[in-house]
Amino acid sequence: MNFEKVVERICDFIRGVVSSSGSTGVVLGLSGGVDSATVAYLCVRALGSERVFALIMPETGVTPEQDVEDAINVAESLGMEYKLIEINDIVRVFKEKAGEGSKIAEANLKPRIRMVLNYYHANSMNRLVAGTGNKSELMVGYFTKYGDGGVDFLPIGDLYKTEVFQLAAYLGVPRRIIEKKPSARLWPGQTDEEEMGISYAELDEILKLIEKGERRDDEKFRRVVQMVERSRHKREMPPVARVRDLL
């Protein structure tokens, strides 16, 4: 990877998106993971720290304290303004009013609450919400629809997870963040690779084959293809019933 050119291209993209929208900057959710840290580094490089605002939104009992510490360290080292909002009370009140849901519904509630907080602050500040999703997650639908998928633009959305690790190291993201097991922190002890049943290295290898139109005759390949196909609705605008020809 030509890191210098990749960073230059992404920074130009960030500046262009913000400028064309008439926004004053960006808001992003900073989790303490490698994706959000990488996006923070890129946004600050593109716009300057004064135009990047971070929200750190842990769930006590689920989010490890190290994640919170890492997120704060990233924000402070980059000179970004940030706010820490624990989401436990919001989750509790929501469930009291809406009633108990299934495990997956309650897990997806957390990123959807974080999305609302991102946009609440972005609207108040006339800013855009910077997404932190990578190409691997986008292709297989490993994100919550209208949760962490609810963003205005995706700086690292064309980089596979394994490439994000490389870019993070180039940008100077702390080593302990890069080496951390990727996790959406949907429940205690949850990790991305265990939930998907495949490592990011294996996943990216298969996704690159799919992108090239090549195939492989094994169960893992077929399962990844199925993940891509079943999550198509997450990557597209809602379908519209066409009736104009009847009017």
From Swiss-Prot:
Keyword set, alphabetical order: ATP-binding, Ligase, Magnesium, Metal-binding, NAD, Nucleotide-binding
Binding site for deamido-NAD(+): 112, 145, 152, 233-234
Keyword Cell cycle: no
Residues noted as binding Mg(2+) in the record, renumbered to the chain: 35, 137
SUPFAM superfamilies from the UniProt entry: Adenine nucleotide alpha hydrolases-like
Known catalytic reactions: deamido-NAD(+) + NH4(+) + ATP = AMP + diphosphate + NAD(+) + H(+)
Gene3D superfamilies per the UniProt record, alphabetical: HUPs (3.40.50.620)
HAMAP family hit by this protein: NadE_ammonia_dep
Protein name stated in the entry: NH(3)-dependent NAD(+) synthetase
Gene symbol of the encoding locus: nadE
